[in-house]
Amino acid sequence: MGKLTILVLVAAVLLSTQVMVQGDADQPADRDAVPRDDNPSGTDGKFMNVLRRFGCPWQPWCG
């Protein structure tokens, strides 16, 4: 009876690890996603976006 219990536990562990490994393969769907437009307002918006990210030397000008 003890060997049967160990066999069932080993089978359960193997199945659970298989499910975990196969479950991770479904996650990276974001790589194929269309990149979003970070600068919808064109070149001027891109410039202002860069200034906002790295800090603007003059706050009233940066908005």
Swiss-Prot record:
Additional note from the record: Exists in two forms, due to cis-trans isomerization at 56-Cys-hydroxyPro-57. The cis conformation is the major form.
UniProt-annotated location(s): Secreted
Major subcellular site: secreted
Region span, Disordered: 23-44
Family in the record: Belongs to the O2 superfamily. Contryphan family.
Name the UniProt record assigns to this protein: Contryphan-Sm
Domain notes: The cysteine framework is C-C.
Modified residues (D-tryptophan): W58
Tissue spec: Expressed by the venom duct.
UniProt-listed InterPro entries: Conotoxin, Contryphan_CS
Gene Ontology annotations for the cellular component aspect, listed alphabetically: extracellular region
Pfam (any one): Conotoxin
Functional note: Its target is unknown, but this toxin may modulate voltage-activated calcium channels (Cav) or calcium-dependent potassium channels (KCa).
GO-annotated molecular function: ion channel inhibitor activity; toxin activity
Residue ranges of the TM segments: none
Disulfide bonds: C56-C62
Residue ranges listed under propeptide: 24-54
Basic and acidic residues bias spans: 28-39
PROSITE patterns cross-referenced by the UniProt entry: CONTRYPHAN (PS60027)
Lineage top rank: taxon: Eukaryota
4-hydroxyproline, modified sites: P57
Residues annotated as signal peptide: 1-23
Alphabetically ordered keywords of this record: Amidation, D-amino acid, Disulfide bond, Hydroxylation, Ion channel impairing toxin, Neurotoxin, Secreted, Signal, Toxin
Transcription is among the record's keywords: no
